[in-house]
Each structure stands twice: as C-alpha cells, then as structure tokens.
C-alpha cells in the first residue's frame, strides 16, 4: 500500500479515535483521580515534544520571530527546525511503547506584548531591541495560541497517553525570561504567574486524569546559576542569593498549586508537578551544594493529598560508561533520600546526555547508558521523559524514528529484552494459572518475568499483564 493511500485511510481513523479518546478522557469532578504515585507508574516511559511549542526568539536584542509580520502559531511551532505536529507522530510513539508525552510550551510571545519596538535598523544592520518596559506581556493568553496548544494536547490524549503541559522558556537563562528564582521577582510576577495558570487550568478543567500540569521549567536565580542556586556568583556560592532563590521556588510552586486548584472542576484533584530549583537533580559529587536543590524543595500545601509530583532533569556525560552508570546510581539514591522522602513521587521530566554528538561518536555507550538509565529510574519508581531525539526534524513528518536503536534501548530499559508489543488483549492484575505464563513469542515461562507476559486466568480467559 502506498504511503499516500495509507495516509488517506489512516487519518480519518485517527480523527475518529481522537474523538472517542478525548471524550473518554473527561472525568466527572466527583470521581476520584488516580494518585500521583499511580500516575507516575502508569506513565511507564515518556518523551518530550521539544523545540516545538516551546520555540521562541529568547533574546530581547534579537527578537527575530517577532520581526515577522502576520505571525501565526505555526511560525513559532516550526521556528526551531521541527515540522507542524501531526497526530500520526503521537500515534507512532504510542505504538512503540511510550505512554506519556511532555508538551513544553512557551507563553510570553503569545500574550499582550505587541513587539512594535522590534524593527530593522539599516544603520546597524540589526534588529532594534524589544522594549519590555513599555511593551509588557500582560496577563492574557492569545486565543489562537491557546487553540493550537489545545489541539496538540488532544493529539496526545487521543492516543490514551498521559500528557504533561507546562510553562517552559518563560524561565531559564534567556533575557526574555520573566519567571526568575528570586523573592523580589516572585513578588512582582506572582499575579501574572497565577493569572496565566488560571487561564490554562480553565481551558482544560474538564479533562481527565491523563492530563497533568507542570508549574514551570528550569527556573534560575538572577545570576542564571545552573547546578545549584548562586553557583554563577563571583564566589561560586552566595548564601543570600541562594536563600532567596530557594524561597522563591517554593513560593512559585505554592502559587501554581493554589491557582490551579482555585479553578475547580477536575482541577480540584488533578495531579500537578513542581520542579526543584533549575530542575536540578543533585547529580555529581564535585560540590557540597549540589544536593541543596533537593533538600531545600518543599512539598506545597494542597487541599487534596497524594496529587503532587516532583520533577528534576538529568544530563550526564557518557564518554566513560562506567562513570555514567555510577552517577546514575548515586543520583537515584540521592533523589529518594532528599526529595521523594518529602512525600511525593518524582519524574525525570527531561533526561539525556551532555556529550556532544553522542549518537554519532559514542553510540554504543549512549545506547547502553539509555537502557541503564531507564532501568535504574524504574527500579527507583521514578518516571522518565527523554528529551528530543528519537524522531527529529523531517522524520516527524513521515513519521518515523531516525534514532530507532536509541528508541529500542529506552523501550527495553522499561519492558525488558522483548521490548513492547501492543497485543489486543485485556489487561489484568490477577494471578495466572500456575504454568500458564508465556512471553510475547509464545514460549512458556516457568514463572512470570519482568515486562509484558501473556497469561491464562483461572476462568480460562487469556490476558496480558505487565510484571514489574
């Protein structure tokens, strides 16, 4: 069957499936949502739809996207080299065994700023700066942008996958960031931050438990310190700067929870995600302050119990595989001791490697590391969302995996050597008849093993079960 004919056949089926899945994703407000712990377990393995709805100019002195006339949502979605997202891409990830997608979204370009100060200067042969002081982003999100975000969320939900929606490059080290880990900045931006989250929450208040909100991405202090707060100060640590940063992170987290809960509906018990300072994971042993982002993070007060999740990010050098594995092991232990112990499960909202061109130059190490990372995280009850890659650029249009071996390593890290198979059998948590457990190739097993098995129940029915 030709690809063109197949697409004509598949797209209407996807549209019908999306309609039913989205309808079933809405849950009555009086029905109990699964706990945060259950949600993290049920996400299994995840991926980031990165460099897409999060794309932005990111530099007040070079607002190159905003210089375009008649900007449309697609201009931003494709600005960093990715195609317009199609539902077939998410279907491909679902069929491969991924059960969750994080959808990073940058909001500031799509609010009230006009960017009228951004013009081409013939004398300097450069764009004039964005005058943020006189062209404020305000508090209202543009409806065209919200509509596109809503469509992409629906693409994920329609596949019966978990979707994490966040505020992304409104934080970070760019000059356009307005969310900064500093007590004075928090006091100034609190109202705006809460207003944005109330709008997002209202837009999706009827969605069911498969949709989660993440309050903010990698929020940094006024010095743009990575690894831990105040690391970028001249002395490499400043207690005053650090204290302000950690206090601000906890304040933003509380504001986020309060704003979402105030909208009612299913948001009253929706699972919500809060990140540590910079989404730092405490990885490494080279500085005594590396654990501070974990230790200083507080679990926000919440009107409901068991519906909050912590998030960290991890990028590790894979040139030395043994060292990388040891770093993963220690990081997982530290997260369990210094963060999960506060009373909420944890996810790696992003993970990958700091090694340049690792897929081309250190592929065997990268593949082994990827599998090991997912295995270690799963053993520690930590969710994983790989950052970018796997299907990138034009490969997303086909769609296809342009790093299929890396995808396989991640999938086998969670499901075991046999990988993932979406067999059309009902799932069960029940025990099989002794001696009636088979692997996905039909081989009888002496006892259930890790991953997906086919089992015969006492009533004679056949089902599939994931054994952890």
Give the role of each language-model region.
Residues 2-14:
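Bacterial N-terminal signal peptides that target proteins for export
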Residues 410-419, 460-467:
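Short, low-complexity, Pro/Ser/Thr/Gly-rich segments in the mature regions of secreted, periplasmic
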Residues 386-392:
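Acidic carboxylate-rich catalytic motifs and surrounding loops in phosphoryl-/glycosyl-chemistry enzymes
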Residues 12-23:
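Bacterial N-terminal signal peptides
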Residues 33-282:
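Active-site mouth of glycoside hydrolases
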Residues 24-29:
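Sec/Tat signal peptide C-region and signal peptidase I cleavage site
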Residues 72-74, 181, 195-210, 216-382, ...:
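Extracellular glycoside hydrolase catalytic/binding regions
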Residues 424-468:
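C-terminal outer-membrane/trafficking sorting elements
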């Amino acid at each position: 069957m030709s690809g063109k004919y197949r697409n004509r056949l598949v797209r209407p089926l996807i549209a019908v499936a999306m309609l039913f899945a989205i309808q079933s994703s809405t849950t009555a407000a009086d029905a109990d949502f699964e706990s945060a712990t259950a949600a993290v377990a049920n996400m299994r393995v995840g991926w980031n739809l990165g460099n897409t709805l999060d794309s932005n100019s990111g530099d007040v002195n070079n607002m190159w996207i905003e210089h375009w006339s008649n900007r449309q949502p697609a201009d931003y979605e494709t600005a960093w080299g990715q195609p317009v997202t199609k539902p077939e891409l998410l279907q491909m990830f679902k069929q491969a065994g991924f059960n969750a997608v994080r959808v990073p979204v940058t909001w500031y370009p799509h609010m009230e700023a006009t960017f009228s100060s951004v013009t081409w200067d013939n004398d300097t042969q450069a764009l004039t700066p964005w005058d943020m002081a006189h062209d404020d982003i305000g508090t209202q999100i543009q409806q065209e942008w919200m509509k596109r975000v809503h469509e992409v969320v629906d693409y994920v939900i329609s596949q019966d996958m978990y979707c994490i929606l966040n505020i992304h490059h409104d934080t970070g080290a760019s000059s356009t960031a307005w969310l900064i880990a500093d007590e004075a900045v928090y006091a100034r931006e609190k109202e705006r931050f809460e207003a944005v989250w109330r709008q997002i929450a209202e837009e999706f208040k009827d969605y069911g438990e498969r949709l989660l909100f993440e309050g903010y991405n990698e929020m940094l202090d006024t010095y743009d310190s990575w690894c831990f707060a105040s690391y970028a100060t001249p002395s490499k640590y400043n207690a005053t700067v650090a204290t302000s940063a950690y206090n601000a992170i906890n304040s933003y987290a509380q504001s986020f929870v309060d704003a979402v809960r105030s909208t009612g509906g299913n948001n009253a018990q929706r699972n919500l995600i809060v990140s540590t300072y910079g989404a730092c994971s405490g990885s490494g042993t080279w500085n005594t302050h590396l654990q501070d982002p974990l230790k200083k993070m507080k679990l926000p007060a919440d009107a409901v119990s068991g519906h909050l999740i912590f998030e960290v990010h991890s990028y590790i050098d894979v040139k030395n595989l043994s060292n990388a594995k040891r770093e993963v092991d220690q990081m997982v232990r530290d997260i369990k001791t210094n963060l999960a112990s506060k009373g909420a499960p944890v996810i790696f909202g992003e993970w990958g490697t700091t090694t340049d061109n690792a897929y081309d130059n250190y592929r065997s190490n990268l593949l082994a590391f990827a599998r090991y990372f997912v295995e270690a995280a799963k053993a520690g009850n930590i969710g994983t969302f790989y950052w970018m890659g796997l299907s990138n650029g034009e490969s997303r249009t086909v769609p296809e995996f342009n790093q299929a071996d890396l995808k396989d390593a991640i999938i086998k890290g969670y499901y075991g050597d046999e990988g993932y198979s979406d067999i059309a059998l009902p799932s069960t948590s029940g025990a099989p008849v002794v001696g009636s457990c088979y692997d996905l190739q039909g081989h009888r097993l002496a006892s259930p093993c890790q991953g997906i098995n086919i089992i015969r129940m006492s009533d004679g029915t056949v089902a599939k079960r994931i054994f952890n």
